[in-house]
């Protein structure tokens, strides 16, 4: 049975003091959580130091929102994997739609980051994939998403998949208040799992974690998580307040 991974992505919100306060509330709120649920928080780079002090030694994993595929060098504004590990980072989000859109990251760059991340002792790498509204309306959803999966996992060995989490996040549902229906999400998640089976093996497909991201909240999370191939959520706005994030967590872990 696959575990449920619930990751809060705080994007460009909170000072380090504010982030640490929210993290402390979450840590306290999940002290006795069901072992089948994994809770993750992803603050800004500048908050990692303070949040690390809160999450260290707890059952809440600490993540980073991106990283360079280089380990050092002339990469102004970027951050290296080793720098993240200094702050106890457990996982890194890669290929988020906002990074693809605003930072110009393409499949080749994202694949380089995946391969670099696998050379470092992160527990997990979250590889995000998803289609735009225009691509969905043209019936290209599966073509786009599965191509991103193939490109993102290029040269990744099956033995490394235990450290890979895939996150399907339809771009049109990110921060818009819109969300895919549970049936729409399940259709894509199932296709992704079948693609993993084709690329690797049935065992790999059965075991890989596939999250859904896109305006997830306390009202829709239970329905989404009830689908066979949805193993968690990458949660934006609803994770910014500890009480709303905890409501989501408690709804799934009950």
Swiss-Prot record:
Stated name of the protein: Triosephosphate isomerase
Q: Isomerase as a keyword?
A: yes
What is the reaction catalyzed? Answer: D-glyceraldehyde 3-phosphate = dihydroxyacetone phosphate
InterPro entries given for it?
Aldolase_TIM, TIM_sf, TrioseP_Isoase_bac/euk, Triosephosphate_isomerase, Triosephosphate_isomerase_AS
Q: Which Gene3D superfamilies match?
A: Aldolase class I (3.20.20.70)
Q: Report the pathway entry.
A: Carbohydrate biosynthesis; gluconeogenesis; Carbohydrate degradation; glycolysis; D-glyceraldehyde 3-phosphate from glycerone phosphate: step 1/1
Summarize the protein's role: Involved in the gluconeogenesis. Catalyzes stereospecifically the conversion of dihydroxyacetone phosphate (DHAP) to D-glyceraldehyde-3-phosphate (G3P).
Family, as annotated: Belongs to the triosephosphate isomerase family.
